[in-house]
């Protein structure tokens, strides 16, 4: 179904000019300049640029990454319904421009922490599809050895996946404090949703980050619904980019990977200059419900979802740009689609056949190093044994 959808889209792109993309100029055979939406600003005299250059290599990379995240999430949906995945599972299809654009705007040595809707960020931070799907199915080959599941995945310079709404806010500020304490040039992206924006601990993190001028980019992924509650019903002020009060803010088109990239570069440079934290609101949209137990159509209409798919889909926006600026051909994008499909299928095969972890694995990685003391007379390294 997805393959047919993409094929129709690519044929349409090839037959007529892009509706949503303005090509400012064509520099060479390997890059093109595009106009992007201007960001709304708060406590800032100037913001990110309104034009940006996209190279062919960058465009192909972003397209592959966004398509991989989309298909990975759809495969996770399938595996959940087949009962290979149990427990909580929050999908981010529709929000691919956020995770890909954010990663494109920072360095690998920078740090990222996010909420439980973490699969896309896990992938863009460097985890393989195989290790992500295997973690979802609770297998040994998962990035957390099958013990973390959907909400608790980790890799180098990525700190999860956090199950408590808004809890990553203070943690992100703490990571930024470590960066400042060490005196390096690194920053921390701290992501949270529009629902978490109403949590008190987010405001507390704002306060300490501003007080100590921490290199922290607070990022509100506003997908318009906190679980099943719209932003208009939950927030006295839905202008989340102004919620920092004394922290400058940007409102960004979160459905445009280039807009997210340029805004992230701007915010990262702001933090690296020693000015303290900055707040970004990414206006985005999730196609699935809040979680797998939420059909996602009781508080919004199917027509609303379809309108976003047809007019603002982040993958289609990039496809339009690539094809109409001749940075890529329809055939090239189809080939990438076939390669991504195979990668996802192979990863799913691994995730459903790899062995589950041994029971005693539950007792591992509780302490960072061997404990030289006893806790209330108990040996903390006693292996868990089956009661059967």
From Swiss-Prot:
Binding site for pyruvate: 90, 116-117, 163, 165, 194-196, 223, 225
GO annotation terms (biological process): glucose metabolic process; pyruvate decarboxylation to acetyl-CoA; pyruvate metabolic process; tricarboxylic acid cycle
Phosphoserine: residues carrying this PTM: 291, 293, 298
Residues that bind thiamine diphosphate: 116-117, 163, 165, 194-196, 223, 290
GO cellular component, one term: pyruvate dehydrogenase complex
Listed GO MF terms: metal ion binding; pyruvate dehydrogenase (acetyl-transferring) activity; pyruvate dehydrogenase (NAD+) activity
PTM section of the record: Phosphorylation at Ser-291, Ser-293 and Ser-298 by PDK family kinases inactivates the enzyme; for this phosphorylation at a single site is sufficient. Phosphorylation at Ser-293 interferes with access to active site, and thereby inactivates the enzyme. Dephosphorylation at all three sites, i.e. at Ser-291, Ser-293 and Ser-298, is required for reactivation.
Catalytic activity: N(6)-[(R)-lipoyl]-L-lysyl-[protein] + pyruvate + H(+) = N(6)-[(R)-S(8)-acetyldihydrolipoyl]-L-lysyl-[protein] + CO2
Phenotypic consequence of residue 298 to A: Slightly reduces enzyme activity
Outcome of swapping residue 293 to D: Abolishes enzyme activity. Increases neuronal cell death in response to glutamate excitotoxicity
Transmembrane regions: none
Cellular compartment(s): Mitochondrion matrix
Keywords: Carbohydrate metabolism, Glucose metabolism, Magnesium, Metal-binding, Mitochondrion, Oxidoreductase, Phosphoprotein, Pyruvate, Thiamine pyrophosphate, Transit peptide, Tricarboxylic acid cycle
Enzyme class, UniProt record, top EC level: oxidoreductase
CC cofactor: thiamine diphosphate; Mg(2+)
Family annotation (InterPro entries): DH_E1, PDH_E1_Alpha_Subunit, Pyrv_DH_E1_asu_subgrp-y, THDP-binding
Description of how the protein assembles with itself and partners: Heterotetramer of two PDHA2 and two PDHB subunits. The heterotetramer interacts with DLAT, and is part of the multimeric pyruvate dehydrogenase complex that contains multiple copies of pyruvate dehydrogenase (E1), dihydrolipoamide acetyltransferase (DLAT, E2) and lipoamide dehydrogenase (DLD, E3). These subunits are bound to an inner core composed of about 48 DLAT and 12 PDHX molecules.
NCBIfam families cross-referenced by the UniProt entry: PDH_E1_alph_y
Function text: The pyruvate dehydrogenase complex catalyzes the overall conversion of pyruvate to acetyl-CoA and CO(2), and thereby links the glycolytic pathway to the tricarboxylic cycle.
Name of the protein described by the UniProt record: Pyruvate dehydrogenase E1 component subunit alpha, testis-specific form, mitochondrial
Organism: Homo sapiens (Human)
